[in-house]
Amino acid sequence: MRLHKRLKQNKSLLPSNSTILLAISGGQDSMALLKLIIDLKRLHQWQVEVWHGNHQWHAKSEETEDELKLWCLKNQISFHSNKADKKEVANEEKARDWRYKNLIMKAKFLSSKNIHFPCTRILTGHTATDRAETVIMNLARGTDLTGLTTLKEQRTIENNIDLTRPLLIFNRNETLEICKDFNLPIWIDPSNENINLTRNKIRKEILPILNSIYKGADSRIASVANRLESYNEDQKLFAKIAIQFCQGEKINSLSRIKLFGLTNSIRQIILSNWLKTMGVKRVTALQIEEINTKVSQRKPPGSIHLHGDFLIRWNKEAIYISNKTN
């Protein structure tokens, strides 16, 4: 089995003798994940817990939750759920934040209930196809290297809690085959059919065209993102050292004079990583290019507003960042 082989290669991905919390929507990817984990749970001595987020986005949301709960109980899997207030999930970004917030709270609760089987892993059903969609979306928006290496196999989201995506070695066609082979129920979310949403348009219209031209294009795009990930980690390490070298007199500043002596591409890498370390969550490659151009040598003092009420300003000697809400 492919997942079992991957777990043997990286034993820290899903440690044995622990509680793992699965985010299950009821769609084909998450149900395939649940089946694979159930089949391996005895071997790895896992306590498997299912969490379902009810966004109340469509008329059958309650029905989906009830039927999924019943299926889990029949298969002797613990089931947990939360219902969202409409304001909490007004858009995709808010909905994602709501899910992760509740998943983290549930993981902490499970750990407190069983200290011998702590819940240190939260699992989602993201596949190689999801990763390919994200790469295409970020490329179209304009991104730096970090934007091409999103949806990592594992990342820390809270102290002692990692978000893990075991299905990145599968594409969506393969998760559908798993569901068919094991006769798994699949609950369709109508919101996934709305092509007015960017990701759905890529999923329904763009990726199928790419796959028809180059069979398996989604898996290869995801593979490129995976290879770039290690390169990106090396770049982050370099940027950390470079930021220390360019540190200004104040903690929220960089020396503009030191930046002048570096190449254009290195300045952009430093600026991109510096902004992220200072708390700027969303910055595009075009914005980095604009900042880099405006703070270049012989350019007059000025300022730029960024997402999240952040303000970048500069004078002759330094570049500063501040949050307008503070």
Curated annotation (Swiss-Prot):
One GO molecular-function entry: ATP binding
Enzyme Commission number(s) of this protein: 6.3.4.19
The organism's place on the tree of life at top rank: Bacteria
Residues binding ATP, per UniProt: S25, G26, G27, Q28, D29, S30
GO cellular component terms given for this protein: cytoplasm
Enzymatic reactions: cytidine(34) in tRNA(Ile2) + L-lysine + ATP = lysidine(34) in tRNA(Ile2) + AMP + diphosphate + H(+)
Gene3D superfamilies referenced in this protein's UniProt entry, alphabetically: HUPs
UniProt free text on domains: The N-terminal region contains the highly conserved SGGXDS motif, predicted to be a P-loop motif involved in ATP binding.
Name the record gives this protein: tRNA(Ile)-lysidine synthase
Species per Swiss-Prot/TrEMBL record: Prochlorococcus marinus (strain NATL2A)
